[in-house]
């Protein structure tokens, strides 16, 4: 046993080099960057009958904000309308600040467009629900979003476009 341990201690390949070279990504902070709630037809809207039509749109962006620091922004726009008019409009920009170390560039985009939004979404969802409820409406719970599935669809669509660009059109 003692011989095995001393052999490991003397092996230069197993000695620490003082650097941490393993890939790491960490959430440093998350925050509401911008929040807007509009209730354009108050107080009449509270007397309207019928279920509103709710339209939800979202977008994801990632920007470098410093050395090994990236801000991932989840933008959610919700519009609720009835046949009498707009009930409410909410616009939320919810962001997360991520520290990145030793991650290959080809792995950053999948993280920023699939995994980071998945991490941020439950918190953004709560902000939307609270804002809608604070505006005098029943809390709006957004359905979960499969960010990974959406990212894979975008990748496949982009690959399809690249393949389609080189393919001949028509019959020869």
Swiss-Prot record:
GO terms of molecular function: unfolded protein binding
Localisation per UniProt entry: Cytoplasm
Segments of this protein annotated with the region Disordered: 1-22
GO biological process per UniProt: protein folding; protein tetramerization; protein transport
Biased composition range(s): Polar residues: 7-20
Pfam families reported in the protein's UniProt record: SecB (PF02556)
Entries under HAMAP family matching the protein: SecB
Function comment: One of the proteins required for the normal export of preproteins out of the cell cytoplasm. It is a molecular chaperone that binds to a subset of precursor proteins, maintaining them in a translocation-competent state. It also specifically binds to its receptor SecA.
Family, similarity comment: Belongs to the SecB family.
Protein name, per record: Protein-export protein SecB
